[in-house]
Amino acid sequence: MVDLPKFTMRDLVECGVHFGHKTSRWNPKMAPYIYGVHNDIHIINLQSTVFLLKNALSALYDIVLKRGRVLFIGTKVQASAIIADEATRCGQYYINNRWLGGMLTNWETISLSIKKLREYEKLLQNVDNQFTKKELLLFEKKRAKLDRSIGGICNMGGLPHVIFVIDTNKERIAIREANKLNIPVIAVLDTNSDPTGIDYPIPGNDDAVRSIDFFCKIISDTILEAIRSDLAKSGINVDGIKDFSVERREDFLKMNKDNKSNKSNTINADENIKESDLIGGSNNEG
């Protein structure tokens, strides 16, 4: 049985998940998820949130268990840092600055930009006085610009298998691109949101920092649990290991396979595996 992260109705209330927008700003398509009105504010039906969140987490778990990549998307100010932190924590990928049209549907061009970013990084790391200070400043400026745009996906290695979105109104272009490519969409839907094109809707407050933090953390926790399950299923002892990188998962599975032909059928957390070896994912650390 899948052991998904636990949460309660009280957790949702304490994070303000139930608070929607003013009634004048609502989207009628969200009517099935609205409990009522209080002080001219729509109140989200948390029973719907609980059911649909569990459904979304279950689907996410299955995708990651099959070694799928997850792309976190949230470019609004209050979501940006949380999106980056939680995607990085579980070894996944993110866009938290600005969605560039074609990031999914024109992946080949994005791949060229990623290659250019890596070239700038390599160039700036191996400078032997061959460039002037002015040239180096120009290179750094170009590197920083690319890093802001694609730093969170430069190690993704291909299209994601699912996207998780905060604020569907703001990220509508990303959702349309995912729909075109049949990439499943998990999204938090506020009372002013349009649920069209969302495969796994989660009714909830997408503006309050505590609510955003709650949703991003539980998504990240689910991803980590799926990765742990995958490694454990393959005979790898995950006791004592806190964080895992999807990128490195294949390495550890291969390592375990090699070990089976030698001494042991398992890889223990204390067998010279450093935590830094298990953490990867996004290029952007800060």
Swiss-Prot record:
**Could you confirm whether the keyword Ribonucleoprotein appears in this record?**
yes
Annotated region Disordered: the residues are 257-286
One GO biological process term is: translation
What Pfam families has UniProt attached to this entry? Ribosomal_S2
Q: One GO molecular function term?
A: structural constituent of ribosome
**Family to which the UniProt record says this protein belongs:** Belongs to the universal ribosomal protein uS2 family.
The record's listing under NCBIfam families reads: rpsB_bact
Q: What is this protein's record name? A: Small ribosomal subunit protein uS2
Q: Which organism is it from?
A: Ehrlichia ruminantium (strain Gardel)
Gene (UniProt): rpsB
